From Swiss-Prot:
Disulfide bonds: none annotated. As part of AP-5, a probable fifth adaptor protein complex it may be involved in endosomal transport. Signal peptide: none annotated. This is AP-5 complex subunit mu-1. It is found in: Cytoplasm, Cytosol; Late endosome membrane; Lysosome membrane. Probably part of the adaptor protein complex 5 (AP-5) a tetramer composed of AP5B1, AP5M1, AP5S1 and AP5Z1. It is a peripheral membrane protein. Belongs to the adaptor complexes medium subunit family. GO terms for cellular component: AP-type membrane coat adaptor complex; cytosol; late endosome; late endosome membrane; lysosomal membrane; lysosome; membrane.
């Protein structure tokens, strides 16, 4: 006798999607019970996008839906109830309660406390009547005294708090939401909302939300068969929410493209109020496969006044953005170097900055240099024993560049500067520094249109992305190098 999920969808003919999800609520604890009860026939509740598409198709509300579909339109499938089966991802989600009133689609998925094959009679599923009762109660609440769209928007903003009272943890207690509203109003009159201890004040001014996604890519490349190259992406989502009210509620969704790399090891700010269990259990220790959770990643929270990090995450991308090799060897008094870099074809070729630093420790100042560079320009800092290869904002069309040269140094006795305890002898590296704006290696982005704000006023929402290199090293393949772990190759 519980509900797995509830949706309110505005039917919008003529738009690309045909509708917009105005409200959705999932109950993870009920979902876990569904896994146990339904066994091998369990079908998870889909995200809003796939559910919206499947529901509009089943209800024949898509603008371009002109063809006859036997599984839906044949005489043997005439629907005499408001119960449907939705085909989502090749699986059949049943039962789904849905009906259309006043251009608003009301939908819910009740818990079936028994096996789904064969389908049990509807009269034996108590959650069906509960789902219908709740949806009708929501409809009555939205349109009982609604005069215009502003009133409707105001009532929609009250639904999260009302469902906490009327349907906690997916169990319906009272379908009359007006009773819950009266109860909340009574509490607000007798016990004014307290300022939380972690929030030092309230904001007054223009409403706005800023979301910034920064990904740092780390890499250690050795150019050796017996040592595996390593790379990892570490992301941070920073937010600044200027919203009026003591406890405004915001929900931000992080999305991935079809070929995006799933987010893992997600750590959230304490202001986040709830999370899908799939987000919490996604770990880099597990092997990434097609079944890995790939979003949307929804974060409902009550923001503090100051800028804060909403979450941190890692991701295992297939390849590093720039592949490189570094060969350095001593030839008498001279040092010969060769550096090759290749930008992976999947990476945006538009840098704010891209340069390679080639330091020479424990050798003294550079006295002579002969070099050949296929692209960019080379700057020489003789006293610092440093070469800086300025690549610029783009790689050439071939995506490959190279640098070769011969150097000599002036030995200053035992006081050679700069000094390093690791880069002794031929142990040396090239360090890449680059930054790409409006881009992430995982493809992660914040959809501004899916941000839900339950506060007074309509905020201006802005989103930013950037990829930054961090500890991006290419070690000399002709010498030993420090490694975090060795490969398991025989």
């Amino acid at each position: 006798m519980a509900l797995r999920a509830v949706w309110l969808i505005r039917h919008e003919p003529g738009t690309p999607l045909g509708g917009t999800v105005k409200f959705s609520r999932r109950y993870p604890t009920v979902e876990k019970r569904a896994k146990v009860f339904n066994g091998m026939n369990y079908v998870p509740v889909p995200e809003d996008g796939p559910f919206l598409k499947a529901l509009l198709f089943q209800l024949r509300l898509l603008d371009d839906d002109k063809d006859f579909v036997e599984s839906r339109d044949s005489c043997s499938n005439i629907n005499k109830t408001s119960i449907y089966g939705l085909s989502v991802g090749g699986e059949d989600l049943w039962p789904v309660i849905a009906f259309l009133r006043n251009d608003m689609i009301y939908a819910s998925v009740p818990l079936v406390e028994q096996a789904l094959s064969p389908r049990p009679p509807l009269i034996s599923i108590s959650g069906v009547s509960q789902g219908l009762e709740l949806l009708l109660g929501v409809h009555d609440f939205l349109y009982s005294s609604q005069k215009n769209d502003t009133d409707l928007h105001s009532r929609l903003s009250q639904l999260p708090d009302l469902l906490l009272q009327a349907c906690p943890l997916g169990t319906l207690l009272d379908a009359n939401l007006q009773n819950s509203l009266n109860s909340l109003n009574f509490v607000s009159v007798t016990q004014p909302q307290k300022q939380p201890a972690w929030k030092v004040g309230t904001y007054k001014g223009k409403a706005q939300i800023s979301i910034s996604i920064t990904e740092n890519v780390k890499s250690m490349q050795y150019g050796k068969q017996d040592i595996a190259d390593t790379w990892q992406v570490v992301g941070t989502v920073a937010c600044k929410c200027d919203l009026e009210g003591v406890m405004p509620n915001v929900t931000i969704s992080l999305n991935l493209p079809t070929n995006g790399s799933p987010l893992q090891d997600i750590i959230v700010h304490p202001c986040v109020t709830s999370l899908d269990s799939a987000i919490l259990t996604s770990s880099s220790i597990d092997t990434v496969d097609d079944s890995a959770f790939s979003g949307p990643y929804k974060f409902p929270f009550t923001p503090p006044l100051e800028s804060f990090n909403l979450c941190h995450y890692t991701s295992q991308v297939p390849v590093p953005p720039i592949l490189g090799s570094y060969h350095m060897k001593e030839d008498g008094a001279q040092l010969k170097i060769t550096v090759n870099l290749k930008l992976h074809e999947s990476v945006r070729n538009n840098f704010e900055i891209c340069e390679a630093h080639i330091p020479f420790y424990n050798r003294g100042p550079i006295t002579h240099l002969e070099y050949k560079v296929s692209f960019g320009q080379l700057e020489v800092f003789r006293e610092k024993s440093l070469l800086v290869w300025i690549i610029g904002q783009k790689f050439p069309k071939s995506m490959e560049i190279s640098l070769s040269g011969t150097l000599t140094f002036r030995v200053q006795g035992h006081n050679r500067q700069p000094f390093d305890h690791i880069c002794i002898g031929s142990t040396a590296y090239v360090k890449l520094n680059f930054r790409i704006a409006d881009y992430t290696l995982t493809g992660c982005y914040a959809d501004q249109h899916s941000v839900q704000v339950f506060a007074s006023g309509k905020p201006k929402i802005s989103a930013y992305r950037k990829l930054i290199s961090s500890d991006y090293y290419i070690w000399n393949s002709k010498a030993s190098a420090p490694v975090t772990y060795a490969s398991l190759l025989p």
